Swiss-Prot record:
Keywords: Cytoplasm, Hydrolase, Methanogenesis, One-carbon metabolism. The gene is mch. Catalyzes the reversible interconversion of 5-formyl-H(4)MPT to methenyl-H(4)MPT(+). It is found in: Cytoplasm. This is Methenyltetrahydromethanopterin cyclohydrolase. Pfam families: MCH.
Amino acid sequence: MLSVNELALEIFDNLADLAEEFNAVYHELDNGARIVDCGVSTRGGYAAGRAFTEICMGGLGEVNFRMGQIKEFPQPFIDVNTDFPSIACLGAQKAGWTVKVGNYFAMGSGPARALSLKPKHTYEVIDYEDDYDCAVICLESDHLPNAEVMNKIAEECHVDVANTCAVVAPTSSIVGSIQVSGRCVETAIYKLNELGFDTRKIASAIGTAPIPPVRGAKRAMGVTNDATIYHGQIQLTMNAPEIKDYLEKIPSSKSKGYGKPFNDIFKEAGYDFYKIDTSLFSPAEVIINELSDGSVYRVGAVNTDVTLKSFGLQ
């Protein structure tokens, strides 16, 4: 069976060995845990953002960058593809682990989740878990984890703390913008899973989303989510004729809150994340190629006006 931690470790080791070339900083704690800072006390960049995103996908996704346009505005875009969408996106990339130890808080994602089985139901549904002896976690945080945090992660993953690795970046950073936009495919897989569709039937997935500008900590969560909600474009290839029953519920435009920048929606919800319609967290546009009869379906559309408003370009 494929090990997402083993595959991610290869990318992590390269990032750690060549940290300076990635504008990253490598740390080894007294307990042996290894950490690469991709944006907390260093600027990071596109190379670090690619490595962070590919680690987050358990080494089962490929990331590339290009320049595109939104209306007349040139914008960087991230392109993501995987031939193991269920494992890469739900089994690794999904931000399904809230890491809270003492005063430390981070959103945890990446292959270490497949060892800790967080959340367990996800791994039951996709029928996958890892048993590798090293854990690699991605932490979205403004602070680096200390030895106590890494000990807790190791304990939850049932590995020695010296075999525990973390890449860390704040949402409000170059790497933060890249890795959140790099979840564009994951949002489609996540949405279908939430709707009850068996995502193991998805053979391949490819997607693109603009990489938003870094607009400060207060705007970071909103602007990074808007990149996919209003401009994420995904194509899924699958052998599942029943997909036609799910089509209309997939795109973000079916959400009650759709049509405003995320930060406006968040403000209207009294800054209570749990009051936001979760169906909003979906890509803007999805193309599905169903292999059993060769059907091709399209749902949703990009919303350039809201994207540009969120990005500060209107």
